[in-house]
A protein has these predicted regions:
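Active-site core of metal-dependent hydrolases
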Residues: 163, 208-309, 321, 327-328
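N-terminal low-complexity segments that are often proline-rich with Ser/Thr-Pro
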Residues: 303-352
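Active-site mouth loops of central-metabolism enzymes
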Residues: 97-109, 173-192, 243
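Divalent metal-dependent hydrolysis catalytic cores, especially in the metallo-beta-lactamase
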Residues: 110-136, 150-159, 202-215, 243, ...
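Boundary at the C-terminal end of the N-terminal hydrophobic targeting segment
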Residues: 18-23
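Bacterial N-terminal signal peptides
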Residues: 7-16
């Protein structure tokens, strides 16, 4: 089987550590994503910053003085991939009470590893939607400065949510009086939280419009932020030049978020025909996490959470090890085109 080399050239563009001199790569095959054609024997030339300066047939390319092309004439090259739903500072093996023992600095260190794995898996741009303590902001800045190897990142910092909701931490008893950084109640408090996360470096705003699977005390399909709260968040974010992404499994929460002016809906697990029509009408992006369930197993989240997960997906396999879902939203997206559909993995890290 012909070797496929993912993101050959954009891989290097987004890794400042990789560059100090111009270079070139000779590709046996190169996917032209604009035309949809697979081109043969192409030369990709880039400058010292990693920016591509030319793509042309190898026979007609004159290389800059002193540049010797990397020979990948037995490989297929394609542009870098984009993942619009990641949590790179998280550990896929830490759920429930085990998360309480992980410090914010430790999550930042985990992010360094996951960013490297993500880039080497072929993803050169990611949107990170939800991280404790602005660890994703620090990771993004480290990558931009050339201190850390990783993809271009658009980050949200802490996700915004209601008290006791999916974006809160509900694991500690009442005497601790603990709540997550993004908790807000009411439209004005929600506006203030938008301003706060933008102040500390958020490129995008992440909110929880519905309950989730891995959070204690809520249900995946239950609405959380009200329509009025989400309208305030969207208005404030847009005023500050930021887009808003809403975690939403439930049918009603999906439609409320779209009506509120939210820019993208994450998961869309129980979207119905009306929700799809609303998304088309409002120009809302639907983001389906294609790899969320394979990330989870009985060993990592337990039977209880897997049972909750089964309420919002149609399992192809319900073995005690892994459950591979047929996400209803992604099927609906294909059937109800044309609407704006994007793919996120929900992955915390890619396999080595």
């Amino acid at each position: 089987m012909r070797k496929i080399l993912l993101v050959l050239f954009f891989f290097f563009i987004l890794s400042p550590l990789a560059f100090c001199a111009p270079g070139a790569v000779r590709c046996g095959k190169l996917l032209d994503v604009r035309s949809g054609k697979l081109l043969s024997d192409q030369m990709v030339v880039f400058d010292a910053s990693g920016t591509i300066t030319s793509v042309s047939s190898s026979s007609s390319t004159k290389l800059p003085n002193g540049v010797t092309a990397i020979d990948l004439s037995n490989a297929t090259c394609l542009p870098g991939l984009v993942d619009v739903h990641t949590h790179l500072t998280g550990d896929p093996g830490s759920h429930g009470y085990s998360r309480l023992g992980i410090s914010v600095p430790r999550e930042a260190v985990t992010g360094v590893k996951n960013a490297r794995l993500t880039l080497r898996a072929g993803f050169t741009s990611v949107r990170n939607v939800g991280a404790h303590g602005f660890t994703d902001v620090a990771l993004r800045d480290g990558i931009d400065a050339g201190d850390v190897e990783g993809p271009r990142m658009s980050v949200s910092g802490p996700a915004l949510g209601i008290t006791g909701g999916h974006c809160d931490n509900n694991l500690l008893p009442s005497e601790f009086r603990y709540k997550s950084d993004g908790v807000a109640g009411g439209p004005w408090a929600a506006r203030a939280k938008v301003r706060e996360v933008v102040k500390y470096g958020a490129d995008v705003i992440k909110i929880c419009a519905s309950g989730g699977v891995l959070s204690k005390g809520d249900q995946p399909g239950t609405p959380q932020f009200t329509l009025e709260e989400m309208q305030a968040i969207a208005e404030e974010a847009h005023k500050l030049g930021r887009k808003v992404a809403a975690h939403a499994h439930g049918t009603q929460s999906i439609k409320d978020a779209i009506r509120a002016g939210i820019d993208s809906i994450e998961h869309c697990s129980l979207i119905d025909d009306e929700g799809i029509a609303l998304a088309k009408q409002h120009g809302t992006y639907l983001v389906f996490d294609i790899s969320s369930v394979p990330t989870f197993s009985v060993q990592t989240i337990g039977n209880h959470c897997l049972a909750r997960l089964s309420r919002i997906v149609n399992p192809v396999s319900i073995s005690t090890g892994w459950r591979w879902p047929l996400l209803m939203g992604s099927i609906a997206c294909e059937r109800k085109s044309p609407i704006s559909c994007n793919v996120g993995t929900l992955l915390l890290r890619y396999l080595q």
